[in-house]
Amino acid sequence: MAETTISTANRVKQWDDKAHIEYIRANRFKRYMGSNENSIIQVKEDLTKKRGDAITIPLVGALDSSGGPNTGSSDLVGNEKALPNDGHRIPVGVVRDATLVNVEEEQASPINIRNAGKVALRDLQMRYLRNDIIGALGSINGVAYGTATTGQKNTWHDGNSDRVLYGAAAGNFVAGDHAASLANIASPGDALTGDLVSLAKRTAQDAVTVNGDGIRPFRYGEDMETFVMFVNTKAFRDLRNWMVTNKFWNDAMQAGKDNPLFSGPTSIHWDGVIVREIPEIGVISGVGAGDPAIDVAPCYLCGAQALAAAWAMRTKSTTRKEDDYGFRYGVGFMEMRGVEKLQYAQGTDEAKDWGVVTTYVAGVADA
């Protein structure tokens, strides 16, 4: 009797799929990722099934309601409404890395160094993805914040004037000058508080969108809506201290438990916003008010389709072929993906961040 055996290729594929799912699930941003237009981070895997070096995410605005409906007193033919739409193109590229060990070192190690290498590689994948998401949140019209020129920052600043906030007052915004606006942020007056979170939420609701009603929130349940704000440790500290001082802390922790975006001690629920601590979000050093100038912490209030992550190739395990007659063992991973903040009118001076209100607050170090 002949028994069926699973081919090596199929075994590897099963391991690859498991590794991909585990690495996505363990990622700090996982609960905000999903495949539909309601997700904070929309995931697309269309290119895993067909050729291409980029994927376009459709962005659809609301139909214009300003003129009211057709009441039957005139023909509808010829008076149909155009559906506002655009698309954000996300190029994909290779992301890979590997680790190498030889037989002698493996023998000397008290741990299973090969398995440890796989675990370490998965952690590295998660850090790469996390860093790319953080970089996308802070990007200036597709350019990394740290490398964007003054002119590029000012163009983004003016183009997104209805969805960028400098400290606790809308008046801190200086037209045409991103740096001067940052210099208006002071401590402690512009530290993150519940009032400032509420201001950021109102900014999202009032943002000028394509025939719409502000930045679209994440929806859950029958009619519940929420935003999520990603903040660094210093901003999270200031908000927590404000809530404890004003005796809001316990109520806020209880209120968030029914929200699918709430993540326990690393989240604070306030006024329909889940504020999520992401320690790896850095500060912009020495750009705020004062002498010396204080550090400023960027915070990102996000609605639906704030970002997108596109995969052309899921995580694939790789091994080194050049093994020096079995003396060296190399294992790695490879995937093809891209992560970007979505924009309407991408690539133009009128480009707008589709689902993000960027909020800059005081980010001073602990005393």
What are these regions (language model features)?
Residues 2-18, 22-34, 38, 156-367:
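Sequence/fold signature of self-assembling virion shell proteins
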Residues 57, 85-171, 219-235, 323-335:
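Long, contiguous amphipathic alpha-helices that act as assembly "spine/axial" helices in icosahedral shell
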Residues 75-79, 109, 117-120, 247-252, ...:
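Short, low-complexity, polar/charged sequence segments that are solvent-exposed and flexible
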Residues 80-85, 115-116, 123-126, 253-258, ...:
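Glycine-rich loops and low-complexity Gly/Arg-rich segments
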